[in-house]
Amino acid sequence: MPTRIDMAKFAKFCKDMGFVYQSSEIYGGINGFWDYGPLGVELKRNIKEAWWQDMVRNPPPGPSGQEIRMVGLDCSIIMNPKVWVASGHVATFADPTRKCPGCGKFTRADQLWAILAESDWMNSLLQEFDPVTGKYDSPRLMKWAKGKGQKLAPNLALVKNPEVTLSFLATRVNGQPEAPPSLQEFTRYVATEQLEATGLQEPCPACGAPLGEAKQVSLMFESHAGLDKTEESKVYLRPETAQGIFANYRNVLDSTRLKLPFGIAQVGKAFRNEVTPRNFTFRSREFEQMEIEFFCHPAESQQWYEYWRDLRKKWYSTLGIQSDNLKPREQGADEVAFYSIGTTDIEYLFPFSDDPQELEGVAHRGAYDLGQHAKHSGMAEKFMYFDEERWNADSAGRTTNSFKEWMKTNPPAADVEKYQFTPHVIEPSAGADRFTLAVLCEAYTEDKVPDAKGNEETRVVMKFHPRLAPIKAAIFPLVNKDGMPERATALYRALKPHFNVFYDDKGAVGRRYRRQDEAGTPFCITIDGQTAEDDTVTIRDRDTLKQERVKVADVRGVIEKALTPGV
């Protein structure tokens, strides 16, 4: 399990190493947007390429051992806004949101208590309250209100009017001594200044003021296409990549002559105007998705749902995510989307939370999306699929080989649906940024290793799976003389067309090792005095620290073996 780590410290490490930067940091940054540095962009690119290779170019056989047919798509970020009307996003893609009248900030209503748990003022105040026993010390709370509280939560009722607020709390405790207040009840009391008039209030995580009522707020970013900024020119940045696939379903079918079952895959940016972006890159306003829409016969859709659910969990494990940290969870009836027949969230136990958080959703979407676009586009026939192979295979006993003529005989609907139907869709939808964060968290390790004198020292090592590691190998000349730099440069240039490799001849070799450990490089290759004698080099393994001598001609093969897919 990833240890609980300070995310601010972790974010600084990621910045210092060139994994992730705050976007436009020189101007104070912008909440919910992140940039990937030199190491981060390679890590994320490797993740996307591994996904494309394993799921699109070379997916494993299907449930019955059949070959899976997959193609790719790259859709526009801005589409005709009617797409989002048909999909239901314009009407329903919103979050319950509460605005603070004190500081003007917004908070997700359904995540209030989780956000409060991360609040600076709340964590400071909890030093004066025991959430297990419900006990507190009034003089200490008064001191906090007149001291730290003034700076951390200036609009909290306890800070503005501590005598009144504490009197409400004392009345509650004295009235029910056998049932001490819970943490949530305590928090509501310290946020309440006029109990009779307002009842218990809930505080703003930023300033402590009582929050307003919850309202549904659209999460879609709006813009305009063209120079006229009118209602007719309004467009949206896509909040998901899936709808572009559904809108192009018929185009793909006609241009590729694919037969069911088949999948359409897409990697691309999506945008959601999140109310409270938080937890580093986990909840961002701009993010990248890796999605598949897999189209199949309705009668076969359940087995395909189970296939993709199991395959996607296994894929994460093959790339270095410990099984104990992966938590597949079937969504309950109260949380599954109204159109979904079933959804499994593949969750990961991030170190910033006590509860697993979603990495990917595998949804059985039924025929909902194609049905919606068939209805709203007025082109219903384009979203139907005619199974010609099955029709021809069942020709025995029919009086006609024409499906149109057969339809004139008014066959039962169940018979028609064997040959002509709206396909069901299984959707494995993964977050490239969330998986990148999970890989960073999983890889981050501090351990003890011997230094040059044999004494133990602490090192930070990023234990990336070799397929995902930003740098596959680093090449060092042991010293900058005796022909070693020339041989090291030659090996570097020989490997560079095949892998992302790094050349370093600065400083002691031990320090060079440490720098590559922090970058997550699986192999360090050193050219030394023996290289000139027998054409061998030492290859150091990042995780075991073991070194072995290998022929220069075999170095490429050693690296390639470590990069072989394992799904």
Describe the residue ranges of each PLM region.
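NTP/phosphate- and nucleic-acid-binding module
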Residues: 1-567
